[in-house]
């Protein structure tokens, strides 16, 4: 965790124009291992498609973090997501990583709340930093910048492998119809 920031900071000092993760003006950092940029996509299955091809080339030391923002609605949603990943990808390791907050007065709060929505006092936001959860305020500057840039996966609007295949099949049929290889159903019925 500290290396991703420390090396990027040293590289930026030595080579001011070097490309690091994040955006112009951000605190420099590198993503861990060969992860996608943290703001690459909201579609978890698009990210999995890319990472599956890459992470299966390694013999160890890889993990796909499914940063979810708030927790999933229930255990069935989590089980369904895990099943889809297990049945459609060869990734050796993956995590479901929701963000949560803790208020000294009101306890556990789902999602990111720097201020408690119940009592209005300061709350601690916890998220996964590599392999474990820690309060975001205790992270180094580079990891905090990574957290700020992080796009969480939108599970509801992500296109599962099954949905992608259906879309592909429908598009293929339309292309065949347009090429005159197959008559449209309405014309065939007439």
Located regions from the model:
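Long, C-terminal-biased catalytic regions of enzyme "large/alpha" subunits
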Residues: 1-190
């Amino acid at each position: 965790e500290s290396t991703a920031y420390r090396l990027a900071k040293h590289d930026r000092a030595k080579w001011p124009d070097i490309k690091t993760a994040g955006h112009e003006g951000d605190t420099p950092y590198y993503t861990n291992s060969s992860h996608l940029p943290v703001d690459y996509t909201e579609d978890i299955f698009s990210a999995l498609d890319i990472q599956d091809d890459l992470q299966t080339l390694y013999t160890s030391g890889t993990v796909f973090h499914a940063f979810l923002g708030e927790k999933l609605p229930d255990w069935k949603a989590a089980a369904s997501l895990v099943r889809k990943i297990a049945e459609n990808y060869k990734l050796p390791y993956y995590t479901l990583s929701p963000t949560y907050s803790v208020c000294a007065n009101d306890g556990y709060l789902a999602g990111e709340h720097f201020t408690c929505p119940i009592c209005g006092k300061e709350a601690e936001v916890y998220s996964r930093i590599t392999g474990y959860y820690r309060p975001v305020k205790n992270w180094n500057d580079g990891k905090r910048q990574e957290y700020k840039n992080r796009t969480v996966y939108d599970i509801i609007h992500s296109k599962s492998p099954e949905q992608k295949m259906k879309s592909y099949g429908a598009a293929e049929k339309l292309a065949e119809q347009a090429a005159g290889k197959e008559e449209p159903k309405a014309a065939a019925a007439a």
